[in-house]
Amino acid sequence: MKAVIIDGYVDEPAILGVPPYVSPYVRYAAGALYYHEIDVDYYTIDQVRDKDLWQSFNHYEYLIIIGGVTVPGHYMGGTPISLTEIDKLFSKNREPLKVLGGSIVKGYTLKGGKAAIPVNPDNVDFIVNGDIEKFLYVYPVSDDYNLNDKSDYDLISKIAPLGAQILKQHPRYPDIIAEMDLSRGCERTNGFCSFCTEPLISGKYRERPLEDLLIEMKAIADVGVKNFRFGRAANFLAYGSKLNNGKPNIPLFQELYSEAVKFAEILHTDNANPAYIIKHKNDIKKLLEIIVKYNTAGDILSFGVESFDENVVRKNRVDIFPEESIEAIRIVNEVGGIRDENGIPKLLPGINLLFGLIGETKETFEINKRYLERIMKEDLLVRRINVRQAMAFPGTLLFKEKPKQHKKEFRKFKEYMESYNHEMLKKVFPMGSILKNVIIEEIRGKISFGRQIGTYPIKTGIIGNFNIFEKTDAIVIDHGARSITALKYPFDINNANINELSAIPGIGKKTAEKIVLSKPITDISKLEIDDTAKRKISFLIKNGSIIKSV
């Protein structure tokens, strides 16, 4: 028997599966099929689009589509599947058993500020409301299946290592990052946020045994993927707390990181509840010290701040108040703000701000601005600030309440964030910072855009023409609002062209032409250019790995 999995990509509060990320869903689904000795082929939805494979799957026994976006996002590595595309795939491939799984079964929308619409059941044999791997584990050998059943970690321990094999079929293999599953559900016991789908999708909070997690990481590393993110957790810092009366589990984290680093070239994380940081300050600082000791620089702990408006926080059952959020940001900066040899901060907070929530007023936008200005004034670093409009899904309080949308104010706030993010990026990635192994993903004219493998990697525009998926090191020279500009590193003035030289701030086209005409250059001080240009050129050549003012 043969099955094909179409990865339509997922993005949820506690999981990301848009390339270069690969979600546990597709790996577990493959593992369940492999367990029953069913051959599996794997395609991303982008491969289907690019190669026009819409009616290429009739010779399979199973056609499985996995997808679902329950938080709004903008993606560089791929575009999540649409309902139209799901219907197209199922209608053009009549022969296989057609199975749909992932959070898309809870509803579909790709745009913030919109309520989700239900999936059309036509052309689908099984819409799996539970966990897709549980259905695929039971159905091939038994009629005793339940489309609402959830997996437990005993099942995951059987199938997860087997599913690692599917990664070799990913079009970007081995330059992908495996989203690792540490826990499911939310550990909060005082209710859930009004908008969050994690309790709907994953149910009651439970934690994966550390030994099983490490076995899967080894299996993934053995197939050639060495990049990992501890992203499949609503609050990563609470991992192991069930074994420690709800408190941070310092010995478990020490074992997790000291073992995981044996398999990893990139080791990053994602979600952290700032309220948990405040509640357990001293223990959390010890956890952060462990992370910073072993992780890869550029790491982020994403905070669900959602709003600095206390009224909005209360009405939406968000777990953190504004002053506590600021304190949590300080704590992560204190421990994680150190930089590696390339000038990249080891671990910084990220902030999620959500609009369209219950109790929001026009003043909410001004309150958020005031708190953001405090962060800037205190010289605190925030790696990224996601500003989004909430998606409303059936089963959430937000879907029931349907609050008023302030679209005009939201647009103005987004404009404000352009200048704010520009200033913050200059602090996080000063001129001279080195980015190793940037993978080119898009070429626009004379600029090649790429990202590193990691958690929310910064979009980097490198002056020059490279090949798609080519890797290069880069040195930062300038900053936008959501991206940075860089030159190939190490910077070689005698091989630099006019486009590269004129991209350096303060060096225009005329100065760049003078430099080119002066080649070969052996002494910067003898160049007939102004002193500011000389200092910048000297800095890039001699001090590329040292962070200092130019």
Protein language model regions, located:
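Conserved SAM/AdoMet-binding glycine-rich loop
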Residues: A3-I6, K218-G350, F355-E360, R374
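Glycine-rich beta-alpha loop elements in corrinoid/cobalamin-binding modules
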Residues: Y42-L155, N437-V438
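Catalytic cores of alpha/beta
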Residues: L110-P118, D283-L287, I358-M376
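Terminal RNA-binding accessory module
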Residues: K407-F491
